[in-house]
Amino acid sequence: MTIYKDARNGRITEEMKKIAEVEGVDPEFVRRGLAAGRIVLLRNLKRADRVKTVAVGEGMLTKVNANIGTSNTLIDVNMEVEKAKIAKKYGADTVMDLSTGGNLDVIRRKIMEAAEPLPLGTVPIYQAFMDVATRKGAGLYMTEDDILNTIEKHLKDGVDFMTLHAALTRDLAAKAVKSDRAEPIVSRGGSILAAWMLEHGKENPLLSNFDYILEMFKEYDAVISLGDSLRPGALEDAHDEYHLSELMVNARLVKRAREAGVQVMLEGPGHVPLDRVVADVKLAKRLTEGAPYYILGPLVTDIAAGYDHIAGAIGGAIAAAHGADFLCYVTPAEHLNLPNPEQVREGVIAFRIAAHAADIVKYPDRAMKVDIEMGRCRGRLDWECMIRLSLDPDKAREIRNQYGPTSIKSCNMCGSLCVFLLLDKWRRKKDEELHAPLA
């Protein structure tokens, strides 16, 4: 029995009670959200006792994912393990292993161990393609069984959610490749599947075998994350016919997953102009009847190379404030290189800021308590309190101490002109005058 089926049957389980406790909502609210497919729980039954309770969807606090993993030109397992630990330390809710180089089974298991208790996601088509490339000399020799067996292997390992690019049809792939899009296909998984379909003249195996895949996910009660192969990789491609056509297919797949009793969420772009971010979220929610929306950024400009974590956090904050549920971080290395550990930290913090800013809008009673406390700490110049409440206490302390200790209670920005010190001095003076003895 999946948690979705339990919820549909009106049963409030211990896991639902735990979600309610973590999120600060009523268990019945959680049950109704799960039953409607508007909330998912990111945990594979194989790891149910080892994974933190992370629920995504309507009424849940906005979650942040950190992508890590090797490339086939830079294989440093120790660095990826360090990235997993950094993502966990600085507050990511989940980690995805996107490795494409090295022994992918070993790497996935090491990252899973390092990231625990965070849920782990993967994109199994990467391993299916790379393993066949290693064995046979070219990834396009992979068969449908290679893909399905890789998915099953990841499920058996305890992977909690997987991106499946099932909505990229053969027809859409052929049209996109010949289109005048700025960037026809920017999804790695999508490009692999497009090349495979065009080479073999067959339909997308993730789509043609979708019912079988649903049965596999149902057994482990893991979550399918429906990938968007034709997401816009440039602002000018946002919401074009290819992007929206794939979204329509994904909406139908959401319905099929729900009918099969499988938890499912939808992935979104990408690169979207600022004035279209809200419309993007509302459209996705409308077409999927409120499926949890997992969005990459979105980046609101294409020219922020080196600062794409900022461009993405701007879009992410707007998207989440208007209903996106799950933000996939972007690092400063986006579009330029494999991120290093420090860039992973910067990406996590940027998107935690975005998620928290959105939650203040969506759930002020739950989210704003810490901001209220921070304001009080600042008002009394309680530096230890300010640092403790910061999203990145290490960074806050580093900057606070960057010129060494100050001789006064304020900081070096204002010195003796600190607004709080000035007002405090004035108040004390007035108080002394008020209580001075009469002449």
Curated annotation (Swiss-Prot):
**Pathway assigned in UniProt:** Cofactor biosynthesis; thiamine diphosphate biosynthesis
Q: Name one Pfam family in it.
A: ThiC_Rad_SAM
Q: Does the keyword Iron-sulfur apply?
A: yes
Principal EC category: lyase
Annotated catalysed reactions: 5-amino-1-(5-phospho-beta-D-ribosyl)imidazole + S-adenosyl-L-methionine = 4-amino-2-methyl-5-(phosphooxymethyl)pyrimidine + CO + 5'-deoxyadenosine + formate + L-methionine + 3 H(+)
Q: Name one GO molecular function term.
A: zinc ion binding
Q: What does this protein do?
A: Catalyzes the synthesis of the hydroxymethylpyrimidine phosphate (HMP-P) moiety of thiamine from aminoimidazole ribotide (AIR) in a radical S-adenosyl-L-methionine (SAM)-dependent reaction.
Official protein name in the record:
Phosphomethylpyrimidine synthase
Q: Which organism is it from?
A: Ignicoccus hospitalis (strain KIN4/I / DSM 18386 / JCM 14125)
The beginning of the lineage is: Archaea, Thermoproteota, Thermoprotei, Desulfurococcales, Desulfurococcaceae
